A protein has these predicted regions:
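C-terminal and inter-domain tail/linker signature
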Residues: 1-181
Length: 181
């Protein structure tokens, strides 16, 4: 890279390692709440100025009400029998991260697609910052192209880079990792 390098990791510069266990407790309780499909009282985990920052299709939500009205409720309406399975969680001070999948049934409208009744796997990554026992920020990446593909809509029109390999349709599952046995 030529020229000056961009500043790296500035959001975690003042991280407090002593907060790790408190952060773990908040995130684990919040994930349990989401798995229990709590809406009315889920606010106990989020700060007043909570921000939820997602990729295209998810959007940016400011505050719990906007998160619930423009993410949590529509998501639950589109997908029933949903369970969240974090395949890995990492905790470091005020920060937590997870990746995993939600397994669900497409039972309501989703991006203009009427319910199909198909079981889908929704892969995601979450990064949270917890301050004073509340989630203040949540960065989210949801693999909507994969969900749409499972519902019969290839947003890449067959030109996705997975087609550059000898085995383009392989379905990776973490339980297939050789060191997991």
């Amino acid at each position: 890279m030529k020229g000056s390098r961009p500043e790296q990791s500035y959001l975690t510069r003042d991280n407090d390692p002593a907060a790790t266990e408190a952060t773990r407790g908040v995130i684990e309780d919040m994930v349990d709440g989401l798995n229990d499909h709590r809406i009315a009282d889920i606010g106990e985990f989020f700060a007043d100025g909570f921000r939820w920052m997602g990729n295209a299709g998810c959007g940016f939500k400011e505050g719990l009400r906007e998160f619930q009205e423009a993410w949590q409720k529509p998501f639950q309406a589109a997908f029933s029998d949903k369970v969240c399975i974090d395949e890995a969680r990492l905790f470091d001070g005020q920060w937590a991260a997870a990746f995993g999948r939600q397994e669900a049934v497409h039972s309501g409208p989703f991006f203009g697609i009427e319910p199909t009744g198909k079981k889908v796997v929704i892969r995601y990554m979450d990064f949270w910052k917890v301050v004073d026992g509340k989630i203040v920020d949540n960065w989210v990446m949801v693999d909507f192209p994969s969900v749409l593909q499972q519902l019969g809509h290839d947003v890449f029109d067959g030109k996705g880079w997975e087609n550059l390999t000898d085995n383009p349709k392989r379905d990776f599952r973490p339980e297939q990792l050789p060191w997991r046995a």
